[in-house]
């Protein structure tokens, strides 16, 4: 649990250091979460443990950014997620998909509290998927953080693009 808190803090700092508040857009970051969820589904379906673990962590990283964009306490979102548990991986995939979609649909229509609720549940389902697959959620999160911690790039129309993916200018 201490490592998870540290990873949340480090990931928050990563986003802040890259000026998420002025460069990031909620709609684009929500779409990024869908992209990472798609990779998680692909990893699971192909029984690719490395991709699955990496994608669980990548989803957690994006959720930190989303929480910052809606100006919510990221630590409390991750802590509250421990109160929700499911056992069946497929149920968790369905529920996570629904939560991501609901977040995207409600970001302009619903209250900030509803957006926060969807993030809490998304983290909970990621943790439940990890447990169902006999992975350690914190290990997955750490794997993803270690991959991005030195990453350079810039915000392009609200989405962070890593340096190697930027078009030649």
Where are these regions (language model features)?
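Flexible "arm" and connector segments at domain edges
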Residues: 1-169
């Amino acid at each position: 649990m201490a490592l998870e808190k540290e990873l949340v803090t480090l990931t928050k700092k990563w986003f802040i250091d890259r000026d998420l508040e002025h460069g990031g857009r909620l709609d684009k970051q929500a779409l990024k979460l869908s992209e990472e969820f798609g990779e998680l589904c692909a990893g699971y379906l192909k029984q690719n443990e490395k991709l699955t673990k990496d994608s669980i962590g990548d989803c957690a990283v994006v959720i930190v950014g989303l929480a910052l964009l809606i100006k919510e306490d990221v630590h409390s979102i991750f802590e509250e997620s421990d109160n929700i548990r499911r056992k069946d991986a497929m149920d968790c995939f369905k529920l996570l998909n629904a939560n991501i979609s609901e977040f995207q649909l409600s970001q302009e229509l619903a209250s900030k509290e509803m957006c926060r609720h969807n993030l809490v549940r998304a983290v909970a389902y990621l943790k439940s998927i990890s447990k169902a697959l006999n992975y350690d959620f914190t290990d997955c999160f750490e794997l993803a953080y270690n991959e991005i911690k030195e990453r350079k790039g810039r915000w392009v129309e609200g989405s962070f693009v890593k340096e190697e993916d930027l078009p030649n200018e």
